[in-house]
Amino acid sequence: MRRFIILATLLLGACTTPGGYVDGPSTPVITADDESIIAYIDKRLVEEYYWLDEVVEKEHTFNRRQQWEEYLPSALSKLVSNADDGGYNHNGQRVYYSFIREDKSTRTQTQGYGISVYPSILAFSNDELAFVVDYIYPDSPAAKSGLRRGDFVVTVNGTAILRSNYQSLLATLLNGTSSIELTYMRQTVAEDEAKSGRVTLSHFAYEENPVVHSEVIELGDRRVGYLVYTSFDADFEEQLMVALQEFHQAAISDIILDLRCNGGGNVSVAQSLASAILGVGYEGKTLCELRRNPLNKRDASTSVIDLRAEEVSLDMERLVVIGSKYTASASEMIIDGLRGLDVEVVLVGSTTEGKNCGMDVTRVRCGSTTVEYAPITFMCYNAKGRGDYGEGISPDVDLTVENVTGYSDEYYPLPRCIWGDASHDIALFAALNAIMEGDATRAVPFVGGGDKITTEVELPREFIGARYDI
């Protein structure tokens, strides 16, 4: 089997992913909108930022003669007490969870192709690269084309992806406004499937429904609800509850919550999900506390997030979670919050990101620009007062090293196959193995029909590695 190298992380924007580089000085043209937005940034930093004490001390050092898009990371870089607000990227640059961005639309529909690209690129040779499909939104142009999770995109509109052009081709793939042609290679195929192909994607409106996969897996005498959930998005809470209702109607005995691609989102949606999983027996018990700086002028109180009655009640006694280094924020709150109630939570995958803080998000119009602004304003603690997972939550089964399943993948969570394929998805295999209490030989035949997990895929060309600043 041939092996490959994962290259530099793609800096794809998301509200729960650290963002905002600290760049060098510049002399841009300052507009009235810049001044208005910077004043709003300052107001919330001084009044609400979790580390506002230091902001008050040092705000006189902030450089306000710059464009508003650059101001927030520049100001935050003057502080030393805010280590939990983000971290450092692979180039050693300081990045932040706190963000401000232009809010162009509040529509639930998105214009595009419906592809989420895995946050690392692969190299076939010194020059040739590939984008990896992380997941596809249901009913999107990409879904209708037959493109699927784990595919390697090797050309865009007939152009090979190279070090010299990958940035522009990635922009075309993510932000294109017309039809697009992609050539792909497929890692795992059935006997009658081609290992490569070409698709043309139309550009039209679709919904970014974060419930990207849901099914009930028959595992001997057990019925396992398997839910792949990519974001705690309040606009799609109804779709989440529909999936859980289907689990309830199927009388599932166990549940696997796949959060490996989920960087967080709305606390209320996480509250609803946890409430539905545990059921009415936990109503009124505290999932977490959101603690703010006592000097916060907008809201210095601690918000207590209690479990509540939901229309769906699964009454699970155990939760198996698939996680990764991209699992963060509200996803980690689910794991840590349930453990604070002494619920058994089995974490399979790798250490999570470690975002134990959150934001009070506001949207406001400043001059001619509407912005969405989310500075870190609170820290998360479970019912036992624990919240120290700033370095991430360690897995019970670490798939990147030797473990109890007998299978590992040093490149995890690189997508290998479609959702639900336990013969090739080592994480799903390990999660089912946990449900079967270590009987891996029982788990695989029931689901994938195979006798091993493919952790090294045979590729037509050799992968070699280098790091690229994206």
Where are these regions (language model features)?
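Extended, small/polar residue-biased N-terminal targeting/export presequences
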Residues: D33-A130, S179-H213
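Bacterial Sec-dependent N-terminal signal peptides
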Residues: L7-E35
